[in-house]
Amino acid sequence: MKSDIYVDFEYGKLKEVIIGIPYEVYGDPSAPCLRENFKYLSKAELEKVFSRAGKSTKEIFEKKPRNKYELMEEENEKLINIFKKFDIKIYRPKLLPKELIKEKYGEDVVKSGYIQQYSRDPFVVVGNNIIELSTSTPVRRAEIFSYKEIFRHCIAHSQGVKWISMPKIPSLEIDKNKDPLLEGGDIFVLGDTILVGTVQGNAKRSNEQGYIWLKNYLGNKYKVIQVHIKEGVLHLDCILSVPRKGLVILCSEALINGIPSYFNDWDIIDISLEESKGLCANGLPIDEENYILSYNDKYKNERIKLELESRGINVFMVYFENHNEDCGSIRCSCNPLFRKVEI
């Protein structure tokens, strides 16, 4: 049956997409779920955590006279203008005020903080399945509430769509070695092959239990492949991108078991771990001929731009400094509702 919610390939022609809004409430450093991440942060990053504690992006004026929300939304608008050139339908979630989050989830969730910019992680569309994911950090759990209204609207005007949810984890404390965890930044839809990135050991993001859950849910129709990535890599989409069939951007040194066999005989643009810090793999295909790539003050990502252009791909560059400083970029900020390869 025809559906207006459908994704078949990472590089299918993009027709409908959700872009997050740059509203974030930064958590209190005393929250246990935040303290466990301190060991991964530099001194400068820790100072930023403490200076932003309890504030929203509308209350942070580190680059006066504009606040962080305004700076990030300006970058979003540049991205949106590109989508408009291709007649892509855009959805934006409503802002979730602290009072609503407190009412729905409790004071502890507000204390832990929450994010609304990076729409990629709370859910994924595989075929005509909308799958709400169970994220590993409490900071990412409340935001799914803002997408449900969009889902309801789309389903009311679609046919054959399945909307399901992974098992939800009610507590702020979780066992990352037992509870199934998945985040959209670790999932790539490539026809009947689904790649799921997991980090070895005590996963900070998606884990093996999450991979097994997705494999069992999708069944024999899909081949779900686990991709082991090195500790320190936030998500699979920080080291992998598929601009079109036969062409992949990846960081081979971040792949524990080497390049997945799915990409045998493909043209590979291999990036270093240092390049991956500039989020040059976190771009977004509009279709197989057009690609959006971010850059910032430190990482211009010019080499990747030239590599893609030399292969006939038109690259749109978007300045994304204020997103990149929070380890997010173009793919993180967008979640396709409709993508389909045109034959």
Features from the language model and the residues they span:
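The feature marks the mature, well-folded catalytic cores of soluble enzymes
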Residues: 1-343
